[in-house]
Amino acid sequence: MSIEWYAVHTLVGQEEKAKANLEKRIKAFGLQDKIFQVLIPTEEVVELREGGKKEVVRKKLFPGYLFIQMDLGDEEEPNEAWEVVRGTPGITGFVGAGMRPVPLSPDEVRHILEVSGLLGKKEAPKAQVAFREGDQVRVVSGPFADFTGTVTEINPERGKVKVMVTIFGRETPVELDFSQVVKA
């Protein structure tokens, strides 16, 4: 018995449906002793909405993929679990070369589980940045409202952006929250 993690292709945007279909098939075929976990890795990110409101949302780390912890059977003769996964509506196949799926390495599994918050300490949601260094932005709130400038530095951990704005004819660096600026 070799329990490994495998990646399977799904139709993009249909990951939840494919997962639900697979979980139903696992129960229907009584394969709880062969297929242990089905995972759609996600992470929490902070998105800035109109009006500067912050919203924490879950984003898929690998759109179009499910990760399955299962016992695939021996090299020559894959077990019934392999066929059940392959025949699940919404799943297009295993990731791997040839007929035999390639298991994920322990490092890959650890990374996926850590980023998903399923292993180790849970990190604060990351801010999703809608702009890059060099982009023109407009300040929408605070003492510099209605100024425009160029992004010179982004600090996603702190949710801050440094913008060069022109004040009285001089370029001046100003540190602002992500919620205070929008792309110009």
Swiss-Prot record:
GO terms for cellular component: cytosol. Keywords: Transcription, Transcription antitermination, Transcription regulation, Transcription termination. SMART domains: KOW (SM00739), NGN (SM00738). GO terms for biological process: DNA-templated transcription termination; regulation of DNA-templated transcription elongation; transcription antitermination; transcription elongation-coupled chromatin remodeling. Pfam families: KOW, NusG. InterPro entries: KOW, NGN, NGN-like_dom, NGN_dom_sf, NusG-like, Rib_uL2_dom2, Transcrpt_antiterm_NusG, Transcrpt_antiterm_NusG_bac_CS. Residues 133-163 form the KOW domain. The keyword Transcription regulation applies. It comes from the Bacteria. PANTHER family: RHO-INTERACTING TRANSCRIPTION TERMINATION FACTOR NUSG (PTHR30265), TRANSCRIPTION TERMINATION_ANTITERMINATION PROTEIN NUSG (PTHR30265:SF2). Belongs to the NusG family. Participates in transcription elongation, termination and antitermination. This is Transcription termination/antitermination protein NusG. It comes from Thermus thermophilus (strain ATCC 27634 / DSM 579 / HB8). The lineage of its organism: Bacteria, Thermotogati, Deinococcota, Deinococci, Thermales. The gene is nusG.
